[in-house]
Amino acid sequence: MNEELNLDLMCGEFKSTLDAKGRMNFPVKVREMFGTSFIISKTIDAECIKVYSLEDWHELVTKIKSLPQTQTAAIQRFLFGSAFQTEPDKQGRILIPAPLREYAGLESDIVIVALSGRAEIWDKAKWDALNSADDTADLAKTAMELGI
C-alpha cells in the first residue's frame, strides 16, 4: 500500500467494463491505494465483490480465526472460499474469476465504488437500482437519525 496516500480518504465512483476474459480496468486512483496486490472476495451483505488490501485481509482473517470455529465456520467458507489474490497487469486490468462474476452478476458494465478505506465492485444495473430515489429517501432518514 502506498504510504503517502491515506486509504481512509479514498472515495469515488468509477465505471469500467468486463472484457470477454473477465478482466476489468482497475482505476489508477484505486490501484494506488491498494498497492500491487490485493484480495477480492464475496461480500456478505450485498451481491458485489469487496476489495481488501493485503493488510486489511490479514486483519480480517486473524479476527475471524480468533473466534470460535463453531460460530464462524460458515463465514470462513463464504469469505475465504471465494477469495482470490490479484495483481493488475501492465495495462492495469485485473481478472475477476468466474465464481465472483457469477455471484455479483457481473456481465459487462460495472462500477467500482471507493468507500473510505475499502472498495466494492458492482454490476452497474444493480448499483443503479441500489441508488434509486426510494433507497435514497430511506438513506436520508437513517442519516438524520444517526446525526450524519
Model-flagged regions — what are they?
Residues M1-S16, A20-K21, K29-T86, K90-Q91, ...:
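Flexible "stalk/tail and boundary" regions
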